[in-house]
Swiss-Prot record:
Quaternary data: Homotrimer.
Catalytic reaction(s) noted: alpha-D-glucosamine 1-phosphate + acetyl-CoA = N-acetyl-alpha-D-glucosamine 1-phosphate + CoA + H(+); N-acetyl-alpha-D-glucosamine 1-phosphate + UTP + H(+) = UDP-N-acetyl-alpha-D-glucosamine + diphosphate
Protein name, entry field: Bifunctional protein GlmU
Pathway linked to the protein: Nucleotide-sugar biosynthesis; UDP-N-acetyl-alpha-D-glucosamine biosynthesis; N-acetyl-alpha-D-glucosamine 1-phosphate from alpha-D-glucosamine 6-phosphate (route II): step 2/2; Nucleotide-sugar biosynthesis; UDP-N-acetyl-alpha-D-glucosamine biosynthesis; UDP-N-acetyl-alpha-D-glucosamine from N-acetyl-alpha-D-glucosamine 1-phosphate: step 1/1; Bacterial outer membrane biogenesis; LPS lipid A biosynthesis
Entry-linked PANTHER family: BIFUNCTIONAL PROTEIN GLMU (PTHR43584:SF3), NUCLEOTIDYL TRANSFERASE (PTHR43584)
Species of the source: Thiobacillus denitrificans (strain ATCC 25259 / T1)
GO cellular component, one term: cytoplasm
Organism phylogeny: Bacteria, Pseudomonadati, Pseudomonadota, Betaproteobacteria, Nitrosomonadales
Keywords of this entry: Acyltransferase, Cell shape, Cell wall biogenesis/degradation, Cytoplasm, Magnesium, Metal-binding, Multifunctional enzyme, Nucleotidyltransferase, Peptidoglycan synthesis, Repeat, Transferase
Biological process according to GO: cell morphogenesis; cell wall organization; lipid A biosynthetic process; peptidoglycan biosynthetic process; regulation of cell shape; UDP-N-acetylglucosamine biosynthetic process
Length: 458
């Protein structure tokens, strides 16, 4: 906790180039709004308070971030970054320091920001700059005798100033008492007719406040999002960072460029992940887990030694040790699979508990079911759990064998060791240890002829 650090996040921009009705800062990167990434960074820095200045989209921004401990200030009309900061000044403690961040710059690291806050703590002006080979569009850092003298916006810069490659990122930290004074002195006599926050640099120089510059470890940390193309670019940068961390932790990625983690992914030892897999929410993979190609996992815990074949979808479920799932399996919310459970191709399981050693290998639907150990479910089996108004549970006890093409009309219980013959429609409980079946008597109609379609003339 940094008891005197206030973080101000500017998030009022419309984002015209996004071509969207959604406020720019609410567009998602890695499964989280852009603003959410910045808020998480602020929280990691231990700020005493975090204030978000919002504008376009009205209350959509505060509503989207309602779970975070934030204060919000509306910038009803956008007249530049200096004007945005002015709206929030009453929220900032005079005896603290203020770090200014941007809601559309989501990849900034805490290790980059910490030195800026430390500079402000020491009474200095902490300024984040970066050197770019092609600095078009950015404000230039003008130095005199190696010291920062001012920042000139691109549209206001002379030819000589446009040749400067050190540019302003907009991210800064200053003692709040200075910030409040300088903001009151800003003028809008520039090409844009706006109040530039960057103009406080010249005021700091005038007042003899030392400007201490720092640069990020990676240039992409300060990249902003103004278009869908830039959003896609930052998504790939972020996913590459995630992939590199996983590789460093010993995870085998068949292709690091074809991985999407949209939340948190925690892996044990010797985990292997094939291409085009998506991980959403919180996903935990135990030792030796193998994930086949094109799987989607959302809020899932998978125990050691389990293998998922291609195109398996698991959502809000727990998978036990040494399981085998897929290909083309769907595990829906509320499902718990115990050890050594096999779920095969085109099987869907919802809100069910499947105990150890049971197998559902082909073309089946199991919903709202409690299944014991060592159960074998034949191909084409359906638990009919919904009567049009209510859902009912099916109970299948240990060591049951269910023949293919069987329907179990819930509520119904199949006793321990029972066998259901193929094609059975079970509407009453099946007793333990017995064969239960229901089917029409087979008959052969002698002399029956299949209808023949008449041949077309010509």
């Amino acid at each position: 906790m940094h008891p005197k650090l206030d973080i101000l996040i500017l998030a009022a921009g419309k984002g015209t180039r996004m071509r969207s009705d959604l406020p720019k800062v609410l567009h998602q990167l890695a499964g989280r709004p852009l603003l959410g990434h910045v808020v998480a960074t602020a929280q990691a820095l231990g700020a005493a308070r975090t204030c978000v200045v919002y504008g376009f989209g009205g209350e959509a921004v505060p509503q989207a971030m309602a779970e975070a401990t934030l204060s919000f200030v509306l910038q009803a009309e956008q007249h530049g970054t200096g004007h945005a900061v002015k709206q929030a000044l009453p929220q900032l403690a005079d005896d603290g320091v203020t770090l200014v961040l941007y809601g559309d710059v989501p990849l900034i690291h805490t290790t980059t920001l910490a030195p800026l806050a430390a500079a402000a703590d020491a009474g200095k002006f902490g300024l984040l700059t970066v050197n770019l080979a092609h600095p078009d569009g950015y404000g230039r850092i003008v130095r005199e005798n190696a010291r920062v003298a001012r920042i000139v916006e691109h549209k206001d810069a002379s030819a000589a100033e446009r040749a400067i490659q050190e540019v302003n990122t907009g991210i800064l930290a200053v003692p709040t008492r200075h910030l409040k004074r300088w903001i009151g002195e800003l003028r809008n006599d520039n090409a844009q007719g706006e109040y530039y926050l960057t103009d406080i640099v010249a005021l700091a120089v005038r007042d003899g406040v030392e400007i201490e510059t720092h640069q990020p470890q990676h240039d992409w940390e300060v990249l902003g999002v103004n278009s869908k193309a830039q959003l896609a670019e930052l998504e790939r940068i972020h996913q590459n960072e995630v992939a590199q961390r996983l590789l460093a932790d010993g995870v085998t990625l068949m292709d690091p460029a074809r991985l999407d983690v949209r939340g948190s992914l925690v892996c044990g030892r010797d985990v292997t992940i094939d291409v085009n897999c998506v991980f959403e929410g919180r996903v935990e993979l135990g030792d030796g887990v193998q994930i086949g190609a094109n799987c989607v996992l959302r809020n899932v815990s998978i125990a050691a030694g389990t293998r998922l074949d291609a195109f398996t979808l698991i959502d809000d479920a727990t998978i036990g040790e040494a399981g085998r799932l897929g290909p083309f399996s769907r595990i829906r919310p509320g499902t718990r699979l115990a050890r050594d459970v096999h779920v095969g191709n085109f099987v869907e399981i919802k809100n069910s508990a499947i105990d150890a050693g049971s197998k559902i290998n082909h073309l089946s639907y199991v919903g709202d079911t409690t299944m014991g150990q060592r159960v074998n479910i034949g191909a084409g089996t359906i638990t009919c759990n919904y009567d049009g108004a209510n859902k009912h549970r099916t109970v299948i006890e240990d060591d049951v064998f269910v023949g293919s093409d069987t329907q179990l009309v819930a509520p119904v219980t199949v006793g321990q060791g029972a066998t259901l013959g193929a094609g059975t429609t079970l509407t009453r409980d099946a007793p333990p240890g017995e064969l239960t079946l229901s089917r029409a008597k087979q008959q052969t109609i002698s002399g029956w002829k299949r209808p023949i379609k008449p041949k077309k003339e010509g």
